[in-house]
């Protein structure tokens, strides 16, 4: 008897059925893997088929032999309406999802996973963002777009800020949201330190559940205004910060259950959805105050938490209409990005989540090895998308398709962006060439290319001024 690991359990279960005649008598097989990783089964026989005890006993023996300590010693079968297991069976049927290896032949294979945390990353069921993709494509609602990086230090937040500025300068109405609650930073780009800042997301999530309608997001939405940066004296950039990082911030953060965001008993999920709806209304009202004709929000850009954090998973997989994901040419980066791309393929949804891939920190023009790295990143991206993003029923695009989702947008490493960027210092930009240079970089070709491709995802044009 050989010990096995967690990663081998599903394969071992399949081996047990390949070696047993019981497979021909079943309509479906559901593998239930509990929080410890132990395996139990729910078997549904074909109509008018009764599974004999001797066959079930042989299956039990095989499961014990192959799964060893990972076998949970339970095989459940459908029973009559009065059976005590009925509620359990109903839960299994409602929560299970098709197994990745299921080919829709008999018997069907299903999986039901039990988790302690990371539901946002492991949830395989189809979900809906705060408003449907259809109304976004029709231009009736803003597109919610998450900026995500598996590793830190790749310029994600800076790229989000640059994209927001680029979109705004071309006539789009944009709002920025700092969802990186454990490492907030968006606020410092746009505003100086204050003795007392406006409340942010962390306050909304706590106060809304206590105060209800008495706590309105519109009273706490910051507005950044700068003609040099936004291209129009009447244009603003609404910003919802993470919150004021003061002596109470950690106490507030400690009261948010981010590990069970998809749990039906966790009120936060609905609060999140309500927040985006309030944000859309509040930002639109701010635009109308400046210009009655410009009262509609086009984009909401979310800065998310690095890595497999529950909140980052919730943002890109549950709330967003698209995601911008960042990677570097390294094994570490591709190991994580592969799983992110696999998750966002949404195998049970009609379509995968639209993605844009950023090749971050790429060598600059003239740096030795640049072309080799760019080529290798493109090749790896195509391979990962081919294996994990496109469904078996889709035709995979040609590897040279520069507008396809796997084709990376290259953002070179910029020494000028290494220092802290304070956009609120730009009030006298014409007198300071170094600050003017920063503006040129943040609204330069790579970010224009990103903004243009982002607009195309939603059937929009980048330049609305012409």
What feature does the model see in each segment?
Residues 229-239, 296, 351-353, 402-407:
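A short helix-to-beta-strand connector/capping loop
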Residues 145-147, 238-241, 301-303, 355-361, ...:
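Extended hydrophobic secondary-structure segments that form protein cores and membrane-embedded regions
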Residues 6, 156, 264-275, 332-336, ...:
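Phosphate/oxyanion-binding active-site loops and adjacent basic polyanion-contact surfaces
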Residues 51-57, 61-63, 170, 273-396, ...:
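Conserved catalytic-core segment of NTP-binding enzymes
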Residues 149-151, 181-183, 244, 306, ...:
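Short, flexible loop/turn elements at secondary-structure junctions
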Residues 2-135, 346-466:
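C-terminal lobe/tail of nucleotide-utilizing enzymes
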Residues 181-292:
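P-loop/Walker-type NTP enzyme "switch/lid" segment
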Residues 131-132, 137-183, 187-189:
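Walker A/P-loop phosphate-binding motif and the immediately C-terminal alpha-helix
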């Amino acid at each position: 008897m050989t010990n096995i690991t967690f990663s081998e359990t599903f394969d071992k279960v399949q081996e047990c059925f390949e070696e047993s005649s019981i497979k021909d008598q079943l309509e479906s097989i559901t593998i239930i893997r509990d929080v410890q990783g132990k395996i139990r089964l729910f078997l549904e026989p074909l109509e008018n088929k009764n599974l004999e005890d001797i066959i079930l006993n042989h299956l039990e023996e095989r499961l014990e032999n192959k799964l060893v300590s990972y076998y949970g010693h339970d095989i459940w079968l459908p029973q009559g309406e009065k059976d005590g297991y009925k509620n359990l069976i109903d839960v299994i049927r409602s929560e299970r999802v098709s197994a990745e290896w299921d080919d829709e032949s008999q018997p069907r294979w299903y999986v039901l996973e039990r988790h302690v945390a990371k539901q946002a990353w492991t949830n395989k069921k189809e979900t809906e963002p705060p408003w449907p993709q259809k109304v976004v494509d029709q231009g009736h609602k803003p597109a919610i777009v998450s900026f995500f990086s598996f590793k830190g230090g790749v310029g994600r937040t800076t790229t989000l800020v640059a994209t927001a500025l680029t979109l705004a300068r071309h006539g789009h109405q944009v709002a920025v949201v700092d969802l990186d609650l454990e490492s907030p930073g968006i606020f410092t780009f746009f505003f100086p330190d204050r003795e007392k800042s406006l409340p942010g997301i962390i306050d909304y999530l706590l106060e809304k559940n206590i105060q209800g309608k008495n706590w309105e997001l519109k009273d706490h939405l910051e507005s950044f205004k700068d003609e040099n940066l936004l291209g129009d004296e009447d244009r603003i950039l609404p910003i919802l910060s993470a919150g004021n990082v003061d002596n109470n911030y950690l106490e507030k953060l400690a009261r948010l259950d981010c590990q069970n965001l998809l749990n039906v008993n966790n009120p936060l999920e609905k609060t999140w959805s309500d927040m985006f709806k309030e944000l859309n209304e509040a930002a639109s009202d701010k635009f109308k105050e400046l210009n009655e004709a410009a009262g509609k929000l086009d984009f909401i850009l979310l800065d998310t938490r690095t890595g497999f954090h529950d909140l980052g998973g919730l943002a890109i997989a549950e709330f967003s209409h698209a995601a911008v994901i960042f990677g570097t040419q390294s094994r570490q980066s591709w190991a994580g990005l592969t799983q992110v791309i696999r998750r966002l393929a949404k195998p049970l949804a009609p379509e995968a989540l639209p993605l844009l891939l950023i090749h971050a920190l790429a060598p600059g023009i003239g740096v030795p090895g640049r072309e080799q790295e760019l080529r290798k990143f493109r090749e790896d991206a195509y391979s990962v998308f081919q294996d994990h993003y496109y469904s078996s029923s889709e035709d995979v695009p040609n590897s040279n398709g520069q507008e396809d989702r796997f084709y990376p947008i290259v953002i070179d490493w910029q020494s000028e962006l290494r220092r802290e960027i304070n956009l609120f210092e730009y009030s006298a930009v014409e007198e300071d060439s170094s600050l003017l240079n920063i503006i040129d970089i943040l609204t330069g070709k790579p970010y224009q290319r990103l903004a243009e491709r982002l607009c195309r995802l939603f059937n929009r044009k980048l330049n609305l001024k012409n």
